[in-house]
Structures are given as structure tokens and as C-alpha cells.
From Swiss-Prot:
UniProtKB keywords: Ribonucleoprotein, Ribosomal protein
GO biological process, one term: translation
Protein name as it appears in the record: Large ribosomal subunit protein bL31B
Species annotation: Halalkalibacterium halodurans (strain ATCC BAA-125 / DSM 18197 / FERM 7344 / JCM 9153 / C-125) (Bacillus halodurans)
One annotated Gene Ontology cellular component of this protein: ribosome
Length: 81
């Protein structure tokens, strides 16, 4: 890699704000907030709104969209049977 053109890649802690779940990962993202991790080191803290701990795909609490309601409204709008 060419020196001086790539951002610094370092360890950061990501925190899911909806569940409080935290995980340590590598990233180029930076933050003014820091947190002390389980290993005793201090890392930058990145707050995210959704992660694998709260996303419906990973939690199994998926909500299926009801397409039948849209079809019924279309039929009613155009007087179809």
C-alpha cells in the first residue's frame, strides 16, 4: 500500500444504542468518546442505532408485510372483483 494516503485502521468499540450491546472491531471510524473495554484498554466508542443484536433479521422477530391490504385497496379503487 502507498504510505500516507490510507486512513488509520484501529480497534474501536461499537455500541448498539437500542440494546446496549457492545462489540470490539477494527475500523477507520473515529470518535471523541472513549470507553474502557473488558481487556482494560481504552478504545474510541462508536454509537450505532442498529446492529446484529437488534436487527430483525438476526433476532428472528421479523414482521412480514401484508401485501393483501394493498391489493384490496386497488380492487376497491377501480371497482374490481
Amino acid at each position: 500500500m502507498k504510505p500516507g494516503i490510507h486512513p488509520d485502521y484501529k480497534k474501536v468499540v461499537f455500541m448498539d444504542t437500542s440494546t446496549g450491546f457492545k462489540f470490539l472491531s477494527g475500523s477507520t471510524k473515529t470518535s471523541n468518546e472513549t470507553i474502557e473495554w473488558e481487556d482494560g484498554n481504552t478504545y474510541p466508542l462508536i454509537k450505532v442505532e442498529i446492529s446484529s443484536d437488534s436487527h430483525p433479521f438476526y433476532t428472528g422477530k421479523q414482521k412480514l408485510a401484508d401485501a393483501g391490504g394493498r391489493v384490496d385497496r386497488f380492487k376497491k379503487k377501480y371497482n374490481l372483483k
